[in-house]
Amino acid sequence: MKRKYRRLFVVIITLSIFAGSVVLVLGKLKNNVSFFYTPTELLSSSLINRPNIRIGGMVVKGTVQKYDDSIVFHITDLKNYIKVVYKGILPPLFSEGSWIVAKGKMVNGKFIASEILAKHDENYMPNKYKTNDL
């Protein structure tokens, strides 16, 4: 019987270590998932007061205003829109009508972005291939 209990003890310890490892890995992955909210979700929730929110949407045409120290534009999810203020260099794919993800926080009804990521669709093609008929 002694050998049976020792084997059971080893199996329980091994399963416990494995379960603990899975919990740690999933906990670390949770922090790296790039989830974003739409303007409608952000405006209709208590997330407005949280720092480091990611918001995604389309840049509204005709709203991009460039100043000496910042860029101001609106993003929409085709239901609501939010004014975004960004200080920094915009990604090359940023343009009116393009989809972006902005990371930042809400301050006085404006979204102050610390980072802008431009999205492209799955049909992206480099400029050198766009002019050639393939």
Swiss-Prot record:
Binding site for heme: H120, Y124
Membrane topology, Cytoplasmic segments: 1-7
Subcellular location: Cell inner membrane
Keyword tRNA processing assigned: no
BP terms from Gene Ontology: cytochrome complex assembly
Stretches assigned to the Periplasmic side: 29-134
One GO molecular-function entry: metal ion binding
Entry membrane topology: Single-pass type II membrane protein
Alphabetic keyword roster: Cell inner membrane, Cell membrane, Cytochrome c-type biogenesis, Heme, Iron, Membrane, Metal-binding, Signal-anchor, Transmembrane, Transmembrane helix
Regions that span the bilayer: 8-28
Cellular component terms per the entry's GO annotation: plasma membrane
UniProt xrefs under Pfam families: CcmE
Family membership noted in the UniProt record: Belongs to the CcmE/CycJ family.
Function, in words: Heme chaperone required for the biogenesis of c-type cytochromes. Transiently binds heme delivered by CcmC and transfers the heme to apo-cytochromes in a process facilitated by CcmF and CcmH.
Name by which UniProt lists this protein: Cytochrome c-type biogenesis protein CcmE
Source organism: Ehrlichia ruminantium (strain Welgevonden)
Lineage: Bacteria, Pseudomonadati, Pseudomonadota, Alphaproteobacteria, Rickettsiales
Gene: ccmE
